[in-house]
C-alpha cells in the first residue's frame, strides 16, 4: 500500500510503539540514535501532514456544516447536530453522550462553563463522522 511514510519510518514507529528506545533501534538498524531521532521526527511530521490533508479533503466534501454560535449551551449541540443530519439524511455515528465527549475533547478552547465563548464549526460528513473546525479559519478559507 502506498504511504506518506518510508519503510524505515514505518519500522521505527513500530519499534517505538513496542517500547524500544531510539538507542536500541539505532543499534538494531546499524545507525546512530540521532539518525533514528530524525527518521522518527520526519515520520511524525508526515503523519501530521497526512491528517491535515484528510481534514482539508473532508472539509471539501462535507455536505453539512454547523456554526455553533457564541452563547450556545453545550448541552444543546447534540440536538443541533441530529437535526441538521436528519435534514441532510445522514446517520450520525454517535449518541448524544458521545457527541458531548467529542465536543469536550475537540472544542475545549471554545467553551467555558458549558457555554460557547467563541464560535466554531462542526462539520458532518456523509459517513456520519463529525469534526470541529475553527470559525475564523473557516471564514478565511471562504
Curated annotation (Swiss-Prot):
GO terms for biological process: DNA-templated transcription initiation. This is Putative transcriptional regulatory protein Mevan_1098. GO terms for molecular function: DNA binding; DNA-binding transcription factor activity. It comes from Methanococcus vannielii (strain ATCC 35089 / DSM 1224 / JCM 13029 / OCM 148 / SB). Keywords: DNA-binding, Transcription, Transcription regulation. Signal peptide: none annotated. It comes from the Archaea. Pfam families: Sigma70_r4, TFX_C. Belongs to the Tfx family. Putative transcriptional regulator. InterPro entries: RNA_pol_sigma70_r4, Tfx_C, Tfx_DNA-bd_arc, Tfx_DNA-bd_euryarc, Tfx_DNA-bd_sf_arc.
Amino acid at each position: 500500500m502506498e504511504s506518506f511514510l518510508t519503510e524505515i519510518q514505518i519500522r521505527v514507529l513500530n519499534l517505538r510503539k513496542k517500547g524500544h528506545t531510539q538507542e536500541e533501534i539505532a543499534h538494531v538498524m546499524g545507525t546512530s540514535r540521532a539518525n533514528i531521532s530524525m527518521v522518527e521526527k520526519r515520520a511524525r511530521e508526515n503523519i501530521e501532514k497526512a491528517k491535515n490533508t484528510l481534514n482539508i479533503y473532508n472539509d471539501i466534501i462535507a455536505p453539512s456544516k454547523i456554526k455553533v454560535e457564541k452563547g450556545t449551551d453545550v448541552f444543546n449541540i447534540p440536538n443541533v447536530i441530529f437535526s441538521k443530519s436528519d435534514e441532510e439524511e445522514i446517520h450520525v455515528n454517535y449518541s448524544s453522550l458521545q457527541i458531548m465527549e467529542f465536543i469536550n475533547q475537540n472544542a475545549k478552547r471554545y467553551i467555558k462553563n458549558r457555554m460557547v465563548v467563541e464560535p466554531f464549526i462542526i462539520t458532518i460528513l456523509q459517513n456520519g463522522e463529525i469534526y470541529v473546525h475553527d470559525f475564523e479559519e473557516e471564514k478565511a478559507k471562504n
